Amino acid sequence: MKYAKYFLFVGIALIGLSSNTTRTSGLSSEGIYPGNLFPDIKNLENKSGTKMNLSDLKGQKILVNFWAAYDAPSHKDNVLFANVIENKKYPVRMVSVSFDKNESVFERTLTMDSIDAKYQFIAKNDAYSSLYDHYQLRKGFKNYLIDENGVIMAMNLSPNDLDQLLKKN
């Protein structure tokens, strides 16, 4: 009986303590999976030499697409994503980061694909390895749909998946 009262007291105390805990502001933590805040990518440079940070686009829906010309599926998807967004006039900014090691290959590919180069970037030097590792791209190139608050809505979408998702939103 003595132990029962003790466990009852401890149980009530724990319930009381847990009910008084406060939640954080409701913001997601930074990470690379849906529901997480997408980490900022800094010093992106396009073929004209313009630099920007991904956070400069906060307040807009963004599709971040990692790709390379030598990787046929990611290259094809890069073109198809651009076409879906442009042709359907979706309110989404596509930011593509290429991992081509040769800058001239990157530039020629953009020209051949007829994609607006303003938000097409190439990962250079230190950015190449840090982005490649951080986003675990050795397992394959990825893409992320990010909402206006920087939270990842979805990842690894096909162009058709993106089209269907944006029709709903």
Where on the chain are the PLM-derived regions?
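Bacterial Sec-dependent N-terminal signal peptides
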Residues: 1-28
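N-terminal "domain-start" segment that seeds a small globular fold
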Residues: 23-54
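Short active-site neighborhood of thiol/selenol oxidoreductases, capturing the structured segment around
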Residues: 52-75
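Hydrophobic beta-strand anchors of alpha/beta hydrolase catalytic cores
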Residues: 63-64, 94, 143
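Active-site-proximal beta-strand/loop segments in catalytic clefts of secreted hydrolases
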Residues: 66-67, 97-100, 123
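Structural microenvironment flanking redox-active thiols in thiol-disulfide oxidoreductases
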Residues: 75-113, 127-132
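Short, internal strand/loop/helix patches
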Residues: 107-148
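Thiol-/selenol-based redox modules, centered on thioredoxin-like
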Residues: 140-169
